[in-house]
């Protein structure tokens, strides 16, 4: 399960419905053009927390139908509604997903015993493997080394998507749990995360920049740090431009420039403006056009 995973982007029609044809095109682009090792389905990049349970199920259905066995798939089923998380976990397990992920429960200030019960309930009810999704800058949930250790005592909890800038904690987790999977979650810090020993990475920009991400990862693993750093610099120039212009809107616009029907973002996200479109064209021409 190691390697570079795109956090799968989901295209929506102007009325907010899922653009199913476009979703299949994005999946194919990731597999055929970006050459990613896997897809992380149902995460933030898919605007997952703004869609219904039935819509989430449809995304999971399309992803596994289109990808089949060509890449690894991880299904993010997390929700502050534990019943929904379990329902989705059971559903995707029946579909054939071999591993789940779940964001730490957020909004309410859950204590660690509640967070632990949340993960153990999903694992127990589904019988599937679990990757913790730790993204404290959005959830407000910061877990300690000892808390990761408590969760990892469950043999079904096999790793973490580590989307945090605390690289001291990342190093400690890596040293303490050499047999657990660690995926870096910040695309702009892939190189230092790889040096610290992550097993792979999951990111939104890999939908359009997956080839560079794979280069950084492989070069760093082979101690070719100077070469990897040059590519990370270029990657971060691209990411800086994307973030300044609207993350999801810009990635979707760049996908359109690549001939992919990437649709629109789901409200309340804004529709992309003409000014944003023009800047996306500049980024595409400078960083991605062959």
Swiss-Prot record:
The protein's annotated pathway: Amino-sugar metabolism; N-acetylneuraminate degradation; D-fructose 6-phosphate from N-acetylneuraminate: step 1/5
A Gene Ontology molecular function term of the record: N-acetylneuraminate lyase activity
Regions that span the bilayer: none
Residues binding aceneuramate: 44-45, 163, 185, 187-188, 204
Gene Ontology CC, one term: cytosol
CDD domains recorded: NAL (cd00954)
SUPFAM superfamilies: Aldolase
Catalytic activity: aceneuramate = aldehydo-N-acetyl-D-mannosamine + pyruvate
Protein name as annotated: N-acetylneuraminate lyase
Originating organism: Fusobacterium nucleatum subsp. nucleatum (strain ATCC 25586 / DSM 15643 / BCRC 10681 / CIP 101130 / JCM 8532 / KCTC 2640 / LMG 13131 / VPI 4355)
């Amino acid at each position: 399960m190691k390697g570079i995973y795109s956090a799968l982007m989901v295209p929506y029609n102007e009325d907010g419905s899922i653009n199913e044809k476009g979703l299949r095109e994005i999946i194919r682009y990731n597999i055929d053009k970006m050459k990613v090792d896997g897809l992380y389905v149902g995460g933030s990049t898919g605007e997952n927390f703004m869609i219904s349970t039935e819509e989430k199920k449809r995304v999971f259905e399309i992803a596994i139908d289109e990808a089949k066995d060509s890449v690894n798939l991880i299904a993010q089923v997390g929700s502050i509604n534990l019943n929904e998380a379990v329902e989705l976990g059971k559903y995707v397990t029946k579909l054939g997903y071999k591993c789940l992920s779940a964001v730490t429960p957020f909004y309410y200030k859950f204590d660690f015993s509640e967070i632990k019960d949340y993960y153990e309930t999903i694992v127990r009810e589904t019988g599937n493997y679990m990757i913790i999704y730790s993204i404290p800058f959005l959830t407000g949930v910061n877990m300690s080394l000892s808390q990761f250790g408590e969760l990892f005592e469950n043999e079904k909890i096999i790793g973490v998507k580590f989307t945090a800038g605390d690289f001291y904690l990342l190093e400690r987790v890596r040293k303490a749990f050499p047999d657990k999977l660690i995926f870096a979650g910040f695309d702009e810090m892939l190189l230092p995360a790889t040096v610290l020993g992550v097993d792979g990475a999951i990111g939104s920009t890999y939908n359009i920049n997956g080839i560079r991400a794979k280069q950084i990862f492989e070069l760093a693993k082979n101690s070719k740090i100077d070469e990897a750093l040059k590519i990370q610099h270029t990657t971060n120039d691209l990411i800086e431009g994307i973030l300044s212009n609207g993350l999801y809107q810009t990635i979707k616009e760049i996908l359109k420039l690549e001939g992919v029907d990437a649709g629109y973002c789901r409200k309340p996200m804004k529709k992309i403006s003409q000014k944003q479109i023009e800047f996306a064209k500049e980024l595409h021409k400078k960083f991605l056009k062959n």
